[in-house]
From Swiss-Prot:
This is Vezatin. It is found in: Cell membrane; Cell projection, Stereocilium membrane; Cell junction, Adherens junction; Nucleus. It comes from Rattus norvegicus (Rat). Keywords: Cell junction, Cell membrane, Cell projection, Coiled coil, Cytoplasmic vesicle, Membrane, Nucleus, Transmembrane, Transmembrane helix. One of its GO terms (biological process) is cell-cell adhesion. Residues 641-667, 769-782 have a biased composition (Basic and acidic residues).
Amino acid sequence: MTPEFDEEVVFENSPLYQYLQDLGHTDFEICSSLSPKTETCLTTEEPQTPPTRVLQKQGILLKLTETIKSWTLSSQYSKKDDLLHKLDTGFRLDALDAILQQEVLLQEDVELIELLDPSILSAGHPQQENGHLPTLCSLATPNIWDVSMLFAFISLLIMLPTWWIVSSWLVWGIILFLYLIIRVLKFWRTAKLQMTLKKYRVRLEDMAANSRAFTNLVRKSLRLIQETEVISRGFTLLLDRVSAACSFNKAAQHPSQHLIGLRKAVYRTVRANFQAARLATLYMLKNYPLNSESDNVTNYICVVPFKELGLGLSEDQISEEEARNLTDGFSLPALKVLFQLWVAQSSEFFRRLALLLSTANSPSGPLLTAALLPHRILSDVTQGLPHAHTACLDELKRSYEFFRYFETQHQSVPQRLPKTQPKWRELNNVHTAVRSLQLHLKALLNEVIILEDELEKLVCTKETQELLSEAYPVLEQRLKLIEPHVQASNSCWEEAISQVDRLLRRNTDQKGKPGVACENPHCTAAPLLRPTLHIEDRDPIPEEQELEAYVDGIDIESEFRKDSLYHVSQEDRERQKREQEESKRVLQELKSVLGFKASEAERQKWKQLLFSDHAVLKSLSPVEPVESVSNSETPMNSDTEQAHSEATEEETSKPCASDKEDTRTEYMCDGPPKGQSKDTSGDQGHLLQGAHQCESEAKPPQAAAAGATAPPTPRDSPRLSIKQRLARLQLSPEYTFTAGLAAEVAARSLSFTTMQEQTFGDEEDEDKEQLVEGGERELEEK
C-alpha cells in the first residue's frame, strides 16, 4: 500500500470487499493484504531457515551458561540481599507497629488505610514472624556458603598431604586471616546498619508518643480554661473545687482574660506543631508519591490554602496583637477549632507515613540497596518535626503546670495569699460559696420539678403494669441526676459555714499577738485596728482631744460594708440612722458646752501636769495638787457650773445606741512594756481612732477614772500614786468638771502605750472589780 491513500483500492477478504461482492460490484482493483515487499522477503527467506537440531543445541548451551553465571552471582550477593531484605522488612513492620500502638490515627484515617492497604493494620499482629529487626546473633550466624567454603578448605588439606609442609602454612594462614577479616568487616557493617535502624525506630516511637502526649496536654489545658471560665461565673463543676472559685472581684472580668498566659501558650504551641506537620506531609506528597488513590487531594488537609483556614495559620510569623485579633482575644472557641485542625493534621501525617512505610512499597530483589532503606526516607521526611514536638510539649507543660498547680492553688488557699491581697477576700469567698449554692439549688429545683411532673403524669394517667415498669428506670435515672446537685449543695453549704467560722475566729492582730475573741455568735468580725497615733505636744487640750477621738469614729457603712454580708431591713436602717443622728446631736451640744478655750496660764499648768517628766516622777503630798490646781482655776459663775452639771447628768442618763447587744468591748489601758523607759517624752500622747463610742458616752468622769486598770508591776508605783491623787482631785468642790476631765485624760495618757481588749456584760460593780483584779494577776504572771 502506498503512502497516499487510494480510494479505488480494496483489500481482499476485507469487510468492504465482502460488502461489494454481496451488492454485485466486481469492477474494482483487488490488492492482497500483504505488501509486495513482505511477500518477496518471505519468498527469499524461506530457503535460508536453519534446521531445528541446530536451534536446540544453541538453546541448551545458552541455558547452561546463564545457570552457571546466575549461580556464581547468587553465591556472591545472596547473603547480602537476604540481610538487606530482613532489615528493610523488619524496620517497616516495627515502624507501622509503633504508629498503630500509639493511637495517633483518627478513626476515619484507620478506615482509609484499611481500604487502601489492609496489610498495614496487621503489622503488629503476633503471627508476623519477621515483624522485628534481626538481632546481632542472627546476623553473626554463618550461612550455607560459609560452611561449604570451610568444608572445602578442610577437604583439600586432607586430600593433599604435601600441603602439610611447614613452608606452605604461612601462605594458607594468610589466606585464612584475610578471609576472616573480610567476614568481620561485613558483620560490622551489617551490625552498624541494624543499630541505625533500631535508633530510627525508637525515634519514630518517641515522635508518636510526644504527639499523643501533646494532644492530651492541649485537651487538658482547654478543659482547665473552660472550668476556670465557668467557675468565674460562680458555678462549680467539681465538688472539691468550691474553694478554688475565683473571688467575685474578678466576676466582671472578660472570660477571655482568665488564664491568659495558658491561652497564649496553647495557641503558640499548637500553631507551631500544625505548621511542622503540614510541611512534612506536603514534602512526602511531593518527593515520595504513591498511587493516585493514596495521593488523592480530597483526602488531605495540607493542600487547603492557609487563607481558608484562618486563625493566623500562615507561614509568616505574626505578632501577639495580630494573633489576639484573629482569635478574638484567644477565646475558647477559636482555640478549640485550632486544636481540631491540629488533631486532623497530625493523624493525616502519620497516615501518609504509614502508607509510605508499608511493605507493599518495599523495593524487591537486587533493586534494594543500603541507600534505599526506609530509615533514610524517615529521616528525610521528618527532619525537624521531632524537635518541634519536643519543644512545644515542654513549653506547654511548663505553662500548664504553673497555672494548674501554682496559680489555682495560690488563689484557693488563703494561707498562701500575699500581703497585698484584697481587703475583703474572706467575704469574697463567702460570696462565691453562696453563689455556687444558689446555682446548684436552682439546678436541683429544675430537676425536681421535672421529676414531679413525670410523677403526676404517671399518677393521673391509668397505665398498664408494663408501661409503669418501663417508667421506673426513668424515675431512677432522674433521681440519679438529682444526687450530684445535692452533694454539691452540701459541699457549698459546708464551705460557706467554714468561711463564716473563719471570719469569726480571725485574729485581729497581724503581728501574731493573741486577741480576745468575741463570744457573741451574732456579732461580726471587727475591722483591723489602725496603729496608735503619736500626738505632738503643740496645743494639748485634753477635753477636745478626747471628744475628737469620740466623734471621728470609723464609718461602719463605708469601711466595713456589712450590708454586703448581712441584709438589714429598711426599718432597722432608719432606726440606726435616727440613733446615730441623735447621738451626734448630743455630742455636738456637749462639745459646744465644754469646748471653751482656756487661758494661757491654765494651759501651761496643764502642760506641766500632763507632759512634764518632773510632774510625773516627783513625789508630792496629797494636798499639793489640790492647791496648785485650785489656785490656777479661774473664777466661774454659778450659771456655768450649773450648765456643766446638767450636761454631765444628761450624759450619764443618755442610753447608748448599741446597748441592745449583750456584750460590749472596751479597750483598757495598761502601763508601758518592760523595755520602755519610765520617762516617756512629754510632748507625745496617744490617740486611738475607732474606739467604741458608747462606752465613752455612757461613763461619767468619775466612773471612767475608777475603771482604769492599774499597772501590775511595782515599777509603776509613782504612777499609781499619781492616779490616786488625781482621783482625789475630783472629790474637791473647787475642782470643776473641765479640770476633772483633764485629770482623767492625764491618768489615761500615762498608761496609754499598750491596749487590752476586754468584754463586759450587765454585771454589777463587784464583778467589774473582780475582772480588773484578774486581769492584773494575768499580766503579773506574763
